[in-house]
Amino acid sequence: MLRIALATLLSITCIAHVQAEEVNVSGSTSVARVMDVLAEQYNNQNSDSFVAVQGIGSTAGITLLEKGATDIGMSSRFLTVQENNESLEVFPIAYDGLAVVVNLANPVQNVSREQLFDIYKGKITNWKQIGGPDQKIAVVTREASSGTRASFESLLGLTRVINDRTVSDINPTNLVVNSNSMVKTIVNHNPHAIGFISEGSVDRSVKAITFEGVEANTKNISEGKYKLARPFLLLHKKDDIDDDADKFIKYVLSKEGQLLIEEYGYTPVKK
């Protein structure tokens, strides 16, 4: 009897799991960091669906959505003219600052817009040129498909137009890595390094310096004082979103969802 009861319970559990509708959310690794938290909380409260988050980069997420391979896309940059067509619904769920980070031992406390521009263009190559030690600057950036990189370059004017397409215009010798965590790892281990990461990813392994004398924090971002800021976007096809995906989006924009976003270090779109 005990074996029969256990078998029955296992069968019921498996059936319930199979019946749960999966909602796939794909895109920006920066947005995925907070989306993982939102999805976990949502999944705990809703047994009839399961939200799966995949951090693969903004461009890849937008592409998957257009191909119908994901339910919801995530982007940490604005969509390009080519990407933003009438079939997509695009909306912000939060705002995030791009923090400029250096090694903990670096005495530099602030960088101006012009200085940061020149560092990434390769015009400023030594820390002594901005009040630091006589050391060559190791410049770290993100991969070409990164929404974080696209936002950073757009905000600083580090782009140019070729054949009607906006492309990167930074120094090609800058070190390219593929995640916020990798930027932090390199900056933490290299006393000469500088990089940029999502403000919500800043931890004690690196030092975030001020930009134009303003600290990257939720208050300064919400008040518009910190100028290296960008939206976290969700997107879906207007005429092709199922009830489970729509329900999760409403949760993200709900009071509970927005509070989780704020608790995780980002600026919510709703208070």
Task: Mark where each language-model region is.
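Exported/periplasmic ABC-transporter solute-binding proteins
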Residues: 20-271
